[in-house]
Amino acid sequence: MRIISYNVNGIRAAIKKGFFDWLKTNPADVICLQETKATQGDVDVKQLEALGYHHYWYSAQKKGYSGVAVFTKIKPDNVQYGTGHKLSDDEGRVIQLDFKDVRLINAYFPSGTSGDLRQTFKYEWLDEMNKYLNKLRKKTTKLILCGDYNIAHTE
């Protein structure tokens, strides 16, 4: 399974810059996108489908903010949206896909750059994510975590 993880910083802007042309030439089975800043309805998904991709979107409730998506040529057995952590789930930060014995998690970790409240939220999110991942590790040995980790000491 070949996987690409890519923070697009807005899927609509990426499309304007040739994202679909790039998709036609890449050899990946699975493409995990972070910071999509859009819903599925904001994108011409017929182009994805014509290239053989199944697509799964988890968007933030706040329009134009955050969000993750996975485009895959391999149909997953199961898709789970979110982790059950409400604040995180409202921001569309985690999507999980199961492929036979492999569990893939695409995550957009929060940044703490916009002040103390967001830094506190980030630490809480990291604690919740760690608990979530530890639970998953007990259920499967083949766990792939990809995404934008936004990890820097002061961010």
Model-derived features: where do they sit?
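Surface-exposed cleft-lining segments at the edges of enzyme active sites
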Residues: 84-85, 110-126
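Short gly/ser/thr-rich secondary-structure transition/capping motifs
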Residues: 11-15, 85-89, 127
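Structured beta-strand-rich core segments of catalytic domains in phosphoester-bond hydrolases
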Residues: 36-37, 44-112
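N-terminal, active-site-proximal structural segment of metallo-dependent hydrolase catalytic domains
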Residues: 1-50, 54, 65-66, 81
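Active-site beta-strand/loop signature of hydrolases that rely on acidic residues for catalysis
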Residues: 7, 23-41, 104, 133-155
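A long, amphipathic alpha-helix that forms part
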Residues: 119-140
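Active-site-proximal beta-strand elements of phosphoester/diester hydrolases
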Residues: 1-9, 101-113, 146
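Nucleotide phosphate-binding site architecture
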Residues: 12, 77, 152
